[in-house]
């Protein structure tokens, strides 16, 4: 890495996996017939995405939205709104199905179809985040074949890097900076408590500062249906402000971080 723009010490990106109903169907296909379960995803599209966009506009931040193709088909007006606000659109599957559950030919079809749908909104899609951050043995080869610039799925570094023998960059992520492990609740399992905003604030602030001190890139992963709850949306804005106050951190899209891969 040659350094971050403007002499910044580190980079950061705010990313949003706009899964809507698809995440619940991907978790259990039987959920397709459970309106109560799916309504959690509908909230993400109906209420939370506009709240998130308002926060980003107030803070002057350009983010990356990873969107399954089927979500774009179901909620095209929301995708158009995201595009109109100038945010990066990136690939998140056609359905929210892990590549590990698909034969190679079906994974390829999902990759091609999802991208075609997203690019029908007038944007170039160069980034890929798989559902559940899972990569199959053929995923990186498919990304290379179809000209994707970057993947944002692995947890083996804190700096963007290039895959060996590949033109595909990796923009690393980590569960600690994902809202789902802290806030997600699935009534089918009842196995975890819902964390408080203050617990997550402490964890995220310490992680961001630690990555900054090491000169890395912090990629925050949020889901509108999770972070966009009324008691959390204010926390999102406060956390973005906290990162902005670290004036030696360059805030960018995931695609822009990928351009600085070693």
Predicted regions and their residues:
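Catalytic alpha-helical scaffold of carbohydrate-active enzymes acting on polysaccharides/glycoconjugates
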Residues: 1-127, 132-176, 198-220, 228-262
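Surface-exposed cleft-lining segments at the edges of enzyme active sites
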Residues: 125, 185-196, 223-225
């Amino acid at each position: 890495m040659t350094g971050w723009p403007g002499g910044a010490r580190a980079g950061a990106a705010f990313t949003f996996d706009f899964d809507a109903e698809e995440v619940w169907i991907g978790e259990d296909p039987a959920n397709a017939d459970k309106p109560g379960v799916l309504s959690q995803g509908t909230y993400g599209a109906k209420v939370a995405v506009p709240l998130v966009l308002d926060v980003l506009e107030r803070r002057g931040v350009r983010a990356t939205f990873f969107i399954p193709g089927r979500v774009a088909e179901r909620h095209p007006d929301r995708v158009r709104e995201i595009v109109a606000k100038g945010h990066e659109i990136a690939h998140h599957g056609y359905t929210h199905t892990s590549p590990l559950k698909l034969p190679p030919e079906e994974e390829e079809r999902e990759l091609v179809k999802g991208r075609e749908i997203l690019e029908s909104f007038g944007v170039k899609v160069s980034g890929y985040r798989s559902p559940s951050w899972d990569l199959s043995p053929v995923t990186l080869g498919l990304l290379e074949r179809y000209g994707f610039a970057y993947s944002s799925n692995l947890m083996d570094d804190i700096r963007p890097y290039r895959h060996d023998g590949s033109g595909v960059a990796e923009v690393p992520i980590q569960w600690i900076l994902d809202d789902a492990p802290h806030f997600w609740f699935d009534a089918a399992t009842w196995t975890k408590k819902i964390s408080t905003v203050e617990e997550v604030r402490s964890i995220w602030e310490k992680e961001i500062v630690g990555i900054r001190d090491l000169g890395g890139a912090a990629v925050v992963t949020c889901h509108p249906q999770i972070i966009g709850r009324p008691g959390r949306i204010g926390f999102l804005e406060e956390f973005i402000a906290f990162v902005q106050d670290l004036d030696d951190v360059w805030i960018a899209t995931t695609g822009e971080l990928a351009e600085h891969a070693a």
